[in-house]
């Protein structure tokens, strides 16, 4: 019996709650007690970096609070909110992506966070569950035809090598012919694969081309310093994969690339609706726990092993072939969603930026106008600052307080900063905001065209919904485009106003004006600005930009009851008819003419700019609601098998039940179960080959052995942690236990689907007495004898790297190399390193 090679045995400084081994790279992720994610290398135990998850969630929560409160100073409960977030967002599960470049974590509050391993950035967060995320699994799609072609190519290569040995004289000629044959085979194989595999479809290159339609947004993605936007282009090149998330009550969600939710399954409610007659314990069960779950690499079958709260163990197999049938469409929609999400983030960031710049400008001006009001109050004047300046503009002679304010309180260079801020806002709008919107509009248009022209998108995209969203985006886009003209008008009005103030100041002070500061001004523009009000928000006010001239159309979105309501443009025109006429003549701040020409597009938009943008940000993602409704309805239950049950109220007996699932390329599913519930110490291997039947074989364990944990290692063997009771001659109970990491073979050949073991049909549950088919024995193991009785002992596998990470307690980790030795060892030569438990 061969030993596993011990690579590292480390004592960690902090307790570890959960951990995960990367399947493709030499990495292990550890989640500490304080919810920090520490990334180490296997071999050297080099610490690469640490992701502080709690700081990410708190910063994100504070950002959301600031967005929701806007100008309100509601910061009294921030500390309490942060404490609640710390407890609610505590990490309970972790899983690597198939390519090893991302890592997903499930939290106590049901939220899921995706981090990029290359730069430790937060890629995405979602909150699709209301209960803790109990288990995560990340599956990469592998086409059946592709795997068969690879096997055929391997066989052909072997035949070619034999021919080379037999015909050594013509070796050079044969090599040239073989190279040509291989090239043709590769071309033919790739051509066949392109018709059925997800990676090469044309829509991938089309999406990449669409990203470059507007160079400004491409420039932004390449030069952005914003840490919250994931710019990774690898998602457009990697194969299609699905993240499976399971919460503590049995709700399952499937996320394409870990980012886009495509399916949600309430397993318990579906079992009660369709399979309550299968077993008498299904109907009264109130919750269930998912023990293990797997999705076949062909995306055809979803197999779940569950335990109900009343002690029933079930195996559920679901037909998910619709994922295979519509995988290209789902793949494209997922990528469009991801690109749309990036663009929306970009739009949100720059809207916040121009809002902050405008608030800063308004605050500077408001401070100056408050000083003016104080001067008027000191002189006992009851007139407004606008009236004083209008009188000055009309008569040319200032009142005493106005004279004092202009002479002593105005710094024209500081006021000119308002113009530069307006110019900066306009630049951001042209460079980033409008291109982001145009890309979003283009994506919605592409999805709308697909829903009309391509039958494959039927059931995934609702044509009417996408059309309504497209119309809404057009209306919002026109409003957004008018914002650029509005900013130009505001800048022009303030330029005239400040130039006039500077001229008056120079006249009162009897000084020669500076030519750089002395610019021409328009008196009508100044008059319209003063009549509008110096404290009036010209940029984000409802009455100036986003007033609706009529009631909303039937196709308009439902209004938000919590958002403030505003007067229509008709009422504003009635109250300020003269003002609006002057505004339109001097700079068209109000855009009444544009509103009249585009009235049909504006009917469904109400509220101020921020309310509209918030509604727009949520509405564009309603495009993808149909896919999450239709796909789950097309899933079909193939079978529900009750395996065994136990009395949870009977605490006198400690029952054990461990299980593991694995799917083979031909959609065969294997299930390993270790249980003491059948009054026997056995390991059952169950095989599912068709829709209706499971068959099984079992292995008898010695009475002193018990399996602590088991996992499938590959398509022919499984790994298990086996505990052995050590009972001395003068004792009845064991005082010490030895723990082994063992590898068992459940299938004869990894590349051969045939199996010489006898499998018996599994009817209702595991029989109490079964014919002994084989004696359980491992062909490779490692004995771990602990110095003290530390528990629990768990392990995780990295199948591609052939590494096992065994955790002993909460702070000790032992890494073992599971690779086969090249040299055979003689039987009986075992040098097990013993650690006493």
UniProtKB/Swiss-Prot annotation:
Residues 59-89, 547-588 are annotated as: Disordered. Residues 59-81, 547-581 have a biased composition (Low complexity). Keywords: Cell cycle, Cell division, Mitosis, Nucleus, Ubl conjugation pathway. The keyword Nucleus applies. Its main location: nucleus. Pathway: Protein modification; protein ubiquitination. GO terms for cellular component: anaphase-promoting complex; nuclear periphery. InterPro entries: APC4, Apc4-like_WD40_dom, APC4_long_dom, WD40/YVTN_repeat-like_dom_sf, WD40_repeat_dom_sf, WD40_rpt. GO terms for biological process: anaphase-promoting complex-dependent catabolic process; cell division; protein K11-linked ubiquitination. This is Anaphase-promoting complex subunit 4. It comes from Dictyostelium discoideum. The lineage of its organism: Eukaryota, Amoebozoa, Evosea, Eumycetozoa, Dictyostelia.
């Amino acid at each position: 019996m061969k030993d596993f090679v011990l690579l590292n045995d480390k004592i960690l400084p902090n307790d570890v709650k959960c951990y995960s081994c990367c399947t493709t790279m030499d990495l292990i992720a550890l989640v500490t007690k304080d919810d920090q994610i520490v990334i180490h290398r296997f071999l050297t135990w080099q610490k690469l970096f640490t992701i502080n998850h709690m700081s990410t969630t708190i910063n994100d929560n504070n950002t959301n609070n600031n967005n929701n409160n806007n100008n309100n100073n509601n910061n009294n409960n921030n500390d309490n909110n942060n404490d609640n977030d710390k407890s609610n967002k505590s990490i309970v599960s972790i899983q690597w992506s198939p390519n090893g470049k991302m890592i997903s974590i499930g939290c106590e509050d049901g939220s899921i966070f995706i981090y990029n391993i290359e730069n430790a950035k937060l890629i995405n967060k979602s909150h699709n569950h209301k209960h803790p995320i109990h288990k995560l699994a990340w599956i990469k799609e592998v086409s059946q035809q592709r795997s068969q072609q690879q096997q055929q190519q391997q066989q052909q290569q072997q035949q070619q090598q034999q021919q080379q040995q037999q015909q050594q004289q013509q070796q050079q000629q044969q090599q040239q012919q073989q190279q040509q044959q291989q090239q043709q085979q590769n071309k033919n194989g790739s051509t066949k694969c392109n018709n059925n595999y997800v990676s090469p479809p044309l829509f991938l290159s089309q999406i990449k081309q669409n990203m470059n339609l507007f160079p400004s947004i491409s420039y932004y993605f390449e030069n952005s310093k914003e840490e919250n936007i994931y710019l990774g282009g690898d998602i457009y090149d990697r194969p299609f994969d699905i993240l499976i998330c399971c919460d503590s009550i049995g709700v399952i969600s499937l996320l394409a690339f870990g980012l886009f939710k495509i399916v949600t399954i309430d397993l318990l409610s579906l079992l009660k609706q369709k399979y309550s007659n299968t077993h008498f314990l299904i109907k009264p069960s109130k919750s269930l726990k998912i023990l293990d779950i797997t999705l076949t690499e062909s995306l055809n079958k979803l197999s779940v092993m569950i335990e109900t709260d009343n002690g029933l163990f079930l195996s559920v197999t679901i037909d998910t072939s619709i994922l295979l049938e519509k995988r290209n469409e789902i793949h494209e929609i997922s990528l469009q969603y991801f690109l749309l999400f990036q663009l929306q983030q970009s739009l949100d960031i720059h809207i916040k930026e121009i809002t902050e710049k405008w608030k800063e400008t308004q605050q500077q001006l408001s401070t100056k106008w408050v000083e003016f009001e104080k001067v008027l109050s000191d002189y006992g004047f009851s007139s407004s600052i606008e009236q004083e300046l209008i009188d000055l503009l009309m008569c040319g002679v200032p009142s005493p307080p106005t004279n004092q304010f202009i002479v002593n309180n105005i710094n024209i260079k500081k006021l000119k900063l308002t113009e530069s801020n307006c110019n900066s806002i306009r630049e951001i709008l042209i460079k980033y905001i409008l291109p982001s919107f145009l890309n979003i509009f283009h994506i919605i248009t592409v999805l709308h065209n697909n829903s009309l022209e391509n039958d494959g998108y039927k059931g995934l995209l609702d044509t009417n919904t996408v059309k309504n969203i497209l119309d809404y985006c057009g209306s919002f886009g026109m409003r957004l485009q008018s914002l650029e003209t509005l900013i130009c008008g505001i800048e022009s009005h303030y330029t005239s106003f400040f130039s006039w103030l500077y001229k008056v100041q120079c006249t009162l002070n009897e000084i020669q004006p500076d030519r750089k500061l002395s610019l021409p001004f328009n008196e009508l523009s100044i008059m319209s600005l003063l009549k509008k009000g110096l404290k009036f928000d010209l940029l984000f006010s409802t009455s100036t930009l986003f007033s609706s001239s009529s009631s909303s159309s039937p196709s308009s979105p439902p209004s938000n009851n919590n958002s403030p309501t505003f007067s229509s443009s008709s009422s504003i025109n009635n109250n300020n008819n003269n003002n609006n006429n002057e505004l339109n003549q001097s700079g068209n701040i109000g855009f009444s003419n544009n509103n009249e020409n585009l009235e049909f597009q504006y009917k469904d938009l109400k509220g101020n700019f921020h309310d509209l943008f918030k509604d727009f940000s949520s509405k564009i993602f309603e495009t993808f609601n149909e896919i999450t409704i239709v796909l789950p309805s097309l899933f079909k239950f193939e079978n529900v098998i009750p395996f065994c049950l136990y009395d949870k109220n009977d605490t006198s007996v400690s029952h054990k039940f461990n299980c593991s699932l694995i799917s083979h390329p031909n959609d065969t599913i294997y299930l390993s179960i270790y249980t003491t519930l059948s009054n026997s110490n056995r390991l059952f291997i169950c095989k599912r080959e068709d829709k209706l039947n499971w068959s099984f074989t079992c292995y008898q364990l010695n009475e002193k052995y018990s399996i602590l944990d088991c996992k499938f290692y590959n398509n022919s063997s499984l790994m298990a942690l086996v505990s052995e009771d050590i009972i001395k001659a003068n004792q009845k109970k064991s005082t010490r236990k030895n723990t082994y990491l063992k590898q068992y073979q459940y299938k004869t050949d990894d590349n051969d689907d045939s199996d010489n073991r006898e499998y018996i049909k599994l009817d209702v549950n595991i029989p109490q007495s079964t014919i002994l088919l084989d004696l359980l024995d491992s062909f490779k193991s490692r004995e771990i004898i602990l110095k003290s009785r530390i528990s629990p002992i768990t392990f995780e596998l990295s199948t591609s790297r052939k590494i096992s990470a065994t955790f002993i307690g909460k702070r000790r980790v032992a890494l073992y190399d599971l690779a086969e030795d090249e040299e055979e060892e003689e039987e009986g030569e075992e040098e097990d390193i013993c650690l006493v438990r």
